[in-house]
Amino acid sequence: LSEEPHPMISIVGALAFGSVIAGRRYRSVNANWTAMHYVLAAPSGVGKNYIKSGINRLLHASGLEDFFGANFYTHASAVYWALNSAPTHICVTDEFGDSFAEARKSENGNKMTVFKAMKQVYSDVDDMFRADAYSMSGLSKKDREEKKMPAVVIPSLTLLGLTTPGQFYNEIKANHIEGGMMNRYVVFNLGRDNVKTKRKMGNGIPSESMVSKVREVRHLDSAPRDYAFDARPNFIEVEFTEEVVAIFSRFKDE
């Protein structure tokens, strides 16, 4: 889609897309799922938003349009209901750094609950995500039953935050690191270098081969698109090869 694509932007988009289409479908022998939280920090004008268009179009073409979630969430309860409706989905959010700034403002407590909820969802990926409880004092038994919020089993929320470096890094405080929020993000920092000029532009329509590969990875011809939010999904267990284990070991040593 972009006239001057950045190779790393394409890689980040592919990682995020792979995270969502494999969500609740694949699990490693070490209980790792594919839902990841990515942040792409790059200056304006390098084509960050093309990721959003590409993921959206490919999910729609593959019949997985409900896997593409809202631009962001207004409150922790919105995170819960989004997963209740689509237990596997991706949130590609623009101006992620601005959302960080809004959450820090005392007058925007709702936005802070969103980040707390997403942090909890990340931790609960191999378990259940439960919404905050509200007082039911004075309600009848029938009303209490209707207001129950069942846990989301194996919540798969992939996050891709798009931001400029200044927006994001200027808002990071010590409590974000100490509280474990930053540990959950895989952050990519890009500059204006390595931009490639394309002589031939694509039409933005996903090819049949791409759609076919998505359906193959998701096993759409032999399995449901997804399982109910309150049901434990049947998954494919993935072994780690010796080469991968060696890479993990080197990473830990560093």
Residue ranges and their predicted role:
Residues 1-254:
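Phosphate-handling catalytic cores of nucleic-acid transaction enzymes
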